[in-house]
Amino acid sequence: MSRSTKKGPFVDVRLLSRVETMNRGNEKRPLKTWSRDSTIFPQMVGHTIAVHDGRRHVPVYITENMVGHKLGEFAPTRTFRGHGGKKADKRGKLK
């Protein structure tokens, strides 16, 4: 279910203020954030934001296509290591 339109999109105030100060100063350095639920705003385009995935910060370069999405969508939290082990090998050998 999406967020109510009367509430507007959520963005961490501290993150947005840091992006705006970097825009005023023409800086382009990575910003570390734990706010995965923040919506990407047009002011963030062109910046690299290091989003925390639970273990480390994943650098995400923000493009125009990402505006309106959440930061957490671009930093996966789970790593898929494949299905099965010995069972999968045995099934393949029997056929």
Curated annotation (Swiss-Prot):
Swiss-Prot/TrEMBL keywords: Ribonucleoprotein, Ribosomal protein, RNA-binding, rRNA-binding
Domain of life: Bacteria
Composition bias type Basic residues, residue spans: 80-95
Protein's name according to its UniProt entry: Small ribosomal subunit protein uS19
Region called Disordered, residue ranges: 76-95
Stated role: Protein S19 forms a complex with S13 that binds strongly to the 16S ribosomal RNA.
Family, as annotated: Belongs to the universal ribosomal protein uS19 family.
GO terms of biological process kind: ribosomal small subunit assembly; translation
GO cellular component, one term: small ribosomal subunit
One MF term in the entry's GO annotations: structural constituent of ribosome
One protein family per Pfam: Ribosomal_S19
Gene name for this UniProt entry: rpsS
PROSITE patterns: RIBOSOMAL_S19
